[in-house]
């Protein structure tokens, strides 16, 4: 079984400003309501150390592999629980230029034998956490763009 979660938000900032927020992993604890910590190099093939905690949920640490890190456009990684096929997630942040700035798309495709057991929690806790993170990225990117413009 597979489950796809998908959110997007329009941001009044250039794609590079949105990327600057997403790629500044050391700053995550100061602003990110979902990914509380993230360490590592944003380059294909590299492993990250990520601690997630949706509101009302338990903290979970995992070590995803970066699949793509294209500045101003996309950050994508794959994480696994235990072994391939048990519970896998491919997470993607895509940044699209719009006439007024950018659109941030955040999505994750979950596959594996545990998906049916975890689907309800993913929909009720993880999807709102994506939306909260999108709002926080928007706030931070727009604040950074306003500073740069002054």
What kind of region is each of these model predictions?
Residues 103-105, 109-150:
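A conserved amphipathic terminal alpha-helix motif
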Residues 45-49:
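Short coil-to-beta transition motif at edge beta-strands of beta-rich domains
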Residues 13, 50, 79, 120-121:
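Short, contiguous strand/loop micro-motifs
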Residues 29, 39, 53-103, 109-114, ...:
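Hydrophobic-ligand binding "helix-grip"
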Residues 1-43, 103, 136, 149-150:
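Hydrophobic ligand-binding cavity/cleft-lining segments
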